[in-house]
Swiss-Prot record:
Produces ATP from ADP in the presence of a proton gradient across the membrane. This is ATP synthase epsilon chain 1. Pfam families: ATP-synt_DE, ATP-synt_DE_N. It is found in: Cell inner membrane. GO terms for molecular function: ATP binding; proton-transporting ATP synthase activity, rotational mechanism. It is a peripheral membrane protein. Belongs to the ATPase epsilon chain family. F-type ATPases have 2 components, CF(1) - the catalytic core - and CF(0) - the membrane proton channel. CF(1) has five subunits: alpha(3), beta(3), gamma(1), delta(1), epsilon(1). CF(0) has three main subunits: a, b and c. One of its GO terms (cellular component) is proton-transporting ATP synthase complex. Keywords: ATP synthesis, Cell inner membrane, Cell membrane, CF(1), Hydrogen ion transport, Ion transport, Membrane, Transport. The keyword Ion transport applies. Its main location: membrane.
Amino acid sequence: MATIKVDVVSAEEQIFSGQAKFVALPGEAGELGILPGHTPLITRIRPGAVRIEAENGEEEFVFVAGGILEVQPGAVTVLADTAIRGKDLDEAKAEDARKRAEEALQNTGSNLEYATAQAELAYATAQLAAIQRLRKLRGQH
């Protein structure tokens, strides 16, 4: 079966590099599915889960907080603002961050504080959704 080279990198480190049969991720206009030979594309990525079906059939999950996606017929590059391996996601921390952001929204004094709290809430909510999606795909409840 045909494969495509996939690289997921953040400012801190390379998160994934390898051959894959399929990649799914949250694009700016909705969920994107990428197969080998995909038409070239550059788009922004929304916070959420990147699912990579590796060459050996195993699935890799990476949470991204946004970034840029570049697709070429033989390569996919995800340049993430922040990226966390699925196995390293901490549900308790994400839930705590969500609660703090919701409280901050209630107690903001300026537009800047409100915008910051909104961004933090969106990040935590996307992280929790990625954790739930990962758990569902792995058959855990």
